[in-house]
Amino acid sequence: YKTRPNSVITRYGDRFEYASPEETPALMSDLVDWYNEEERKGELSPVELAALFHYRYIRIHPFEDGNGRIARLMVNYILSRHGWPMIVVRSRKKQEYLEALHQTDMVVGAIPSVGAHANIKQITIFLKYFEELVAKEIQTDIDFVTCKDEDLWWYDGEIITTRSKNIARILRLMRENPSITYAELTSSLGINTSAVQKLVKRMVDNGYIARHENGAWRVIATSVV
């Protein structure tokens, strides 16, 4: 566990305290005991249990670093062991996650030991955010496995939306032939080389594709077919 305080300065400029190094071992022991007891009782749904575990854990912040990642890993462990899909807090939406935690902190209060023993009624704001996140993940999984359109591609958990059909065509051509050249893309698409280069640059910038040192293309986006 941590050996020194790991308080943070929030984006609002105030200092937020987590559990002290002295408190941490006992609070973590309480957390594990509480989790085992709640699982045994079965009064909380898996989503409620995962959300409340996450919040309590975050208020302890038991390690020097990586607490958020470990919290989300434990959430997925709890969800998956109960047959629920795992979730991802995507980088571009991390602010929503942090804001939900902050608003919940305002309700629960600043004392770390109180936060580490919060109940489900106190974390309504974070629970609402968490339930919506799980619901979106379920819908994404359903959309992915039921879609049969070969022109639809996914990246970072969402359908790639673009006005240009050539994006999907380039992805398909690169997947079929990673060594394809700009000249071959131009010929296959029936558009000029400059337009192809602009599309490819946009795709690289968006993270849909990458180029190996040997010049071959790596398609990172995922086709639904």
Residue positions per predicted region:
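FIC/Doc superfamily catalytic core
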Residues: 1-225
